[in-house]
Amino acid sequence: MRRLFTSESVTEGHPDKICDQISDAILDEILKKDPYARVACETAVTTGLVLVMGEITTQCYVDIPKVVRKVVEEIGYTRAKFGFDADTCAVITSIDEQSPDIALGVDKALEAKRGELSDSEIEAIGAGDQGLMFGFACDETEELMPMPIMLAHKLARRLAEVRKNGTLSYLRPDGKTQVTVEYEDDKPVRVDSVVVSAQHAPEIDHDTIERDIIEHVIKPIIPENMIDDKTKIFVNPTGRFVIGGPQGDSGLTGRKIIVDTYGGYARHGGGAFSGKDPTKVDRSASYAARYVAKNIVAAGLAKKCEVQLAYAIGVATPLEIGIDTFGTGKISDEKISEIVKQVFDLRPAAIIRDLDLRRPIYRQVAAYGHFGRHDLDLPWEKTDKVDILKKLAGI
């Protein structure tokens, strides 16, 4: 059976991604000085303005406007004619402390209050909120990620690369990519279409941009054996993309959650990642779920695996650890679920401990995806549980 599947990505200069990077840069700066800080930092951008808001509980001081300007400058918004300039944009902050009602549940988990967990067993942290999270892995790519989102991310990163290294110096920071992959019997066989929208200087004509993007962005990224004479390529299909970034659209933290994860190929619990410290299970449990799913696929227990976790606020033990291998498992999903419970401790404190999440590691994943990042040394991408999983599964 043949089918098509599409995923998109955006560059670091996309308005929503600017916000994600600012929120995570502030989080990193705080975690450098206070690893136990509570941070829920949201950012909004529009023409000439950055608004940083949220709840932060910490003993340290961080110069938020300085962090904001540094991020905006590194992305490449350094001229007023771009409609957004690191030196001249206004930065407004509105920060409160975390609600003491939430802290009550997170600081000491419900089980610890009832005496069900000893402090020597684990530093008992209850989940910072209720919610459901998904993790996913499949054997379509070496990163154990779906092919459409990986190609879309690589195209978006390549757009930024050729802009910054001067290969295509007329490009500006905003941009989007989209890849449609054709599957036959659940295996990717060809790329059906590629869409690249790249912000550019006004004096460059469309034909030049199209030729350059195909030559310097698309050809180096899309494998030759995945393209044929029926593959459709669209470069700036409106013909012009001069006004972009926060001048073209306002941006908000947490509005690119599908780009951040699996490109729509797997389910999503709805919670965003950026700007949240690791006591927020929206973030930490999603990373843990990916860690579990990736190890299951890497161990050969399944070709495809989706892990669902669910939590109650203030309760450490997950309410659910669900496994779905979509019929690709070497053993039953129920058996895999039992093995997962033996191998992985999915209480929030254990996730934070085992994945070492109280570190300033978040700005680097705030653009181009949180998963499948072979360019980074991310703890949730390690496959260090493969041997024990194989042993317990008997394969």
Curated annotation (Swiss-Prot):
Pfam families: S-AdoMet_synt_C, S-AdoMet_synt_M, S-AdoMet_synt_N. Its EC number is 2.5.1.6. One of its GO terms (biological process) is S-adenosylmethionine biosynthetic process. GO terms for molecular function: ATP binding; magnesium ion binding; methionine adenosyltransferase activity. The keyword Nucleotide-binding applies. PROSITE patterns: ADOMET_SYNTHASE_1 (PS00376), ADOMET_SYNTHASE_2 (PS00377). Pathway: Amino-acid biosynthesis; S-adenosyl-L-methionine biosynthesis; S-adenosyl-L-methionine from L-methionine: step 1/1. K(+) binds at residue 42. It comes from the Bacteria. It is found in: Cytoplasm. Transmembrane segments: none annotated. InterPro entries: ADOMET_SYNTHASE_CS, S-AdoMet_synt_C, S-AdoMet_synt_central, S-AdoMet_synt_N, S-AdoMet_synthetase, S-AdoMet_synthetase_sfam. It catalyses: L-methionine + ATP + H2O = S-adenosyl-L-methionine + phosphate + diphosphate. L-methionine binds at residues 55, 98, 249, 280. Residues 98-108 are annotated as: Flexible loop. Its main location: cytoplasm. Binds 2 divalent ions per subunit. Binds 1 potassium ion per subunit. Mg(2+) binds at residue 16. Belongs to the AdoMet synthase family. PANTHER family: S-ADENOSYLMETHIONINE SYNTHETASE (PTHR11964). Catalyzes the formation of S-adenosylmethionine (AdoMet) from methionine and ATP. The overall synthetic reaction is composed of two sequential steps, AdoMet formation and the subsequent tripolyphosphate hydrolysis which occurs prior to release of AdoMet from the enzyme. Homotetramer; dimer of dimers. This is S-adenosylmethionine synthase. It comes from Thermoanaerobacter pseudethanolicus (strain ATCC 33223 / 39E) (Clostridium thermohydrosulfuricum).
